[in-house]
Structure formats: C-alpha cells, structure tokens
Design a protein with these regions (language model features):
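Compact beta-sheet-dominated domain cores in extracellular/mature segments
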Residues: 2-9, 14-17, 21-123
Length: 123
C-alpha cells in the first residue's frame, strides 16, 4: 500500500510539471521590452510591437485594438507602465493602463478605442 501511495504521489508531481510546461508554451507572443497590441481578442489578428512611445497609431491599428500585452522591462527610474489614449497625439481619455507584465485578452470598455500610447512611470 505504501508503494502504491508513493507511485501515485510521483505521478501527480510529474503531471503537475507537465501542466506547468504546457502553460508556458501558450504564453503570449510579445518580445521582452515591448508593448504589443492586437486587432482581435485573445491576442489574435494583426499584431504591432512597440519598444517606445507611438503618438500616432497607423490606420490599420487606430481604433482597431482588442488585446494588449506589456512586456516592458522594470527597474529604478524606468517607465514600465503603458498608457493607451483614445486619440492620436496622446489626446482624449486613457482607455487602458498596463502594469509591467500585464496582459489583457479583451476589455469591452477599451476595445477598438486606442489611437496612441506612451510609456509612463505609473498608471
């Protein structure tokens, strides 16, 4: 009986490891140091990657954003949050503000409203 319990425990540990590995394989495709935005929910459709500010989202992304990921690098004095504005040239309301490492697969209030973004020290 003790041997069966040990085998079951080992099997559960192995299964947990496999599940963790599977989850890592499905991570959002956005390079380290970048803010990424997609035209469809769940990180699908056309993707644009930004390592800096963009005060004028091009026509194929302007007001077409549906999912977002902030893979910016954090550190002392580093602007690592991303503020998304509904107008170009950082005008209008902030539709979203993403903290470092934050990924949003869909947000109905911000969907198709982005026009520009800037890196900031905080939200």
């Amino acid at each position: 009986m003790k041997r069966l319990t040990a085998l079951l425990a080992a099997a559960l540990i192995c299964t947990g490891t496999v599940l963790a590995t599977s989850a890592d394989a499905e991570a959002v495709s956005c390079r380290r140091g970048y803010f990424c935005v997609w035209t469809h929910a769940n990180f699908d459709g056309m993707k644009i990657e930004h390592s800096g500010d963009d005060h004028w989202w091009e026509g194929n992304m302007n007001n077409q954003d549906s999912s977002w990921a902030n893979h910016g690098v954090s550190g002392p004095g580093v602007k690592d949050h991303v503020k998304i504005y509904d107008g170009r040239e950082l005008t209008g309301d902030v539709t979203l503000c993403l903290a470092p490492g934050q990924e949003i697969s869909y947000n109905g209030g911000a969907n198709d409203k982005g026009g520009s973004h800037t890196w900031a020290s905080r939200c």
